[in-house]
A protein has these predicted regions:
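Compositional signal for N-terminal targeting/processing segments
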Residues: 1-126
Length: 126
């Protein structure tokens, strides 16, 4: 049984003003869907699932596409060892595509993730 488009869309619409985009990293198909959704109708803001410290370097790198790059932020883990947090800047990344389209369409962006010194991975249990 096929799911109608309006039913599928309503699953991700929390209110008339808030809509969710589920993302799959590294999927060109998902990046294309993000592009189409952002250009099909008007949005007030794009919530970016990254901390505000990524905003300036990431948006500069997005303006430099088609050059693929990576944004790297040095950090320390719980034991104090050097580690990094990184974001690949590739148009096949749905987050990058969303930022790219939002910048081109004049849609404001809000970087909404917390700034953390140590990221503790939480294993997914199915």
């Amino acid at each position: 049984m096929a799911v109608s488009s309006s039913t599928a869309d309503s699953v991700f619409r929390l209110s008339p003003r808030i809509e969710l985009f589920p993302l799959l990293h590294g999927s060109g198909d998902v990046a294309q869907e993000v592009r189409e959704r952002l250009t099909d109708r008007r949005f007030d803001c794009l919530a970016v699932p990254l901390p505000p410290s990524f905003e300036h370097p990431l948006e500069e790198a997005v303006m430099d596409l088609s050059t693929i790059s990576v944004i790297v932020q040095p950090e320390r883990d719980q034991e104090g060892a050097a580690t990094v947090n990184y974001v690949p800047v590739d148009p096949c990344q749905a987050v990058v595509m969303g930022i790219r389209v939002a910048m081109g369409e004049g849609i404001p962006r809000a970087y909404i993730d917390r700034e953390t010194a140590v990221v503790e991975p939480v294993p997914f249990v199915s």
